[in-house]
């Protein structure tokens, strides 16, 4: 198994500097990670730096709360794609989901999918804030709305991916969607557990440590 191709090498901290982004990019090129996952302000820079590589540019939409309007999320997508983003990790409207306003949740995802064109859309459902039934419903709605992935977490809500959540999400979406595990994957053992549970992508700032079999103290 080529572990690197499962990893979105991630730096989403609000205080991330250009030097840190460049380090992330260099590591991604060296280890041939699937993508770098970065905030939208760095997409254009990353796309230019990675244009002759096999590393994709992934960015986040409505991050980290998911509480933007659908129109705002759609504009973020259009801007990110224009700047060179290949993949888009959006956050659902979590409050709407918990209220049972499922049409609103679905239309929010659909707005992002439509704006993305043929680009990959991953839907972050923020599992740490949901009951198991809400996780199932969010995964079902993501499938109905035409997303490509369901994703566990932002890493900013006090919890990350668990094996149990990945299994639950995969059970719901089956082969129709892929599952991305993110948040708290700090070493090769964690990584393998997520893959065994059904994830086909792992978001982690510890990509290098995972590949090297080391341990990271990062929360994402």
Swiss-Prot record:
Disulfide bonds: none annotated. The active site is at 89 (proton donor/acceptor), 151 (schiff-base intermediate with acetaldehyde), 180 (proton donor/acceptor). Its EC number is 4.1.2.4. This is Deoxyribose-phosphate aldolase. The keyword Cytoplasm applies. It is found in: Cytoplasm. Catalyzes a reversible aldol reaction between acetaldehyde and D-glyceraldehyde 3-phosphate to generate 2-deoxy-D-ribose 5-phosphate. It is an enzyme of class 4 (lyase). It holds the Pfam family DeoC. GO terms for cellular component: cytoplasm. It comes from the Bacteria. The gene is deoC. Keywords: Cytoplasm, Lyase, Schiff base. Belongs to the DeoC/FbaB aldolase family. DeoC type 1 subfamily. GO terms for molecular function: deoxyribose-phosphate aldolase activity. Pathway: Carbohydrate degradation; 2-deoxy-D-ribose 1-phosphate degradation; D-glyceraldehyde 3-phosphate and acetaldehyde from 2-deoxy-alpha-D-ribose 1-phosphate: step 2/2. One of its GO terms (biological process) is deoxyribonucleotide catabolic process. It catalyses: 2-deoxy-D-ribose 5-phosphate = D-glyceraldehyde 3-phosphate + acetaldehyde. InterPro entries: Aldolase_TIM, DeoC, DeoC/FbaB/LacD_aldolase, DeoC_typeI.
